[in-house]
């Protein structure tokens, strides 16, 4: 039997994710490094969680590294035209969150705007297709069809999402061969992305409560591209 966590506890963990993205939206600048971004996130998470036991892990990748999906922070220096992915998992108390947003240093190119719109549409179709009783392996194919229809077929090599809560990553994941059923009370993520290896990549991820009727979004944070453009 799966361990279930309350949506209220997940939302408390997500308060730290929200603070982290706010810190980046106001604090990111050209000339900063991935490690600088990490420190902004650390300060924000620590401020929200205070003395409560907590930790965080995540992907802090900028520039062409975004096309390789994931990685720890480095001394890479952000420059105009870069993208930056923050995929952040926070443990607050005994419960984990897991979200992702992508930042743009300057106005995104037309192709990047099209890719981002495809990512959001991909997430939306995932939301429409998941409810209690859904077979996990059935979720990703419609997401991939959305990307292909918009010109980005084959550009998402990873799963479409997974369970979260007692740990930052739990099965079932939304991937081929994972034929477990999603259950009411599960907390899941949907994390579509588009990756142009050697150039750039992007990803958006939210956390949801699985119900008999569908998904309840637990992270009502902005996801529109204009909210994540860093002035250069």
Regions found by a protein language model. Give the residues of each.
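Active-site neighborhoods and metal-handling regions in enzymes and metal-associated proteins
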Residues: 1-232
């Amino acid at each position: 039997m799966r361990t279930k966590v309350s949506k209220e506890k997940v939302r408390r963990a997500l308060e730290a994710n929200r603070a982290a993205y706010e810190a980046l939206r106001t604090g990111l600048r050209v000339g900063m490094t991935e490690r600088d971004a990490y420190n902004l996130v650390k300060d924000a998470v620590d401020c929200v969680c205070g003395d409560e036991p907590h930790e965080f892990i995540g992907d802090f990748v900028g520039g062409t590294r975004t096309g390789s999906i994931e990685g720890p922070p480095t001394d890479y220096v952000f420059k105009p035209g870069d993208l930056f992915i923050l995929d952040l998992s926070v443990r607050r108390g005994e419960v984990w969150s897991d979200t992702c947003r992508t930042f743009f240093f300057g106005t995104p190119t037309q192709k990047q705007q099209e890719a981002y719109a495809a990512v959001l549409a991909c997430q939306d179709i995932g939301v429409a297709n998941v409810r209690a009783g859904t077979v996990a392996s059935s979720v990703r194919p419609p997401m991939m069809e959305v990307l292909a229809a918009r010109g980005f077929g084959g550009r998402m090599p990873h799963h479409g999402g997974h369970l979260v809560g007692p740990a930052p990553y739990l099965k079932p994941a939304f991937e081929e061969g994972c034929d477990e059923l999603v259950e009411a009370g599960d907390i899941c993520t949907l994390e579509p992305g588009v990756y142009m290896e050697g150039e750039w990549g992007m990803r958006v991820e939210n956390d949801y409560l699985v119900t008999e009727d569908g998904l309840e979004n637990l992270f009502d944070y902005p996801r529109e591209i204009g909210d994540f453009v860093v002035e250069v």
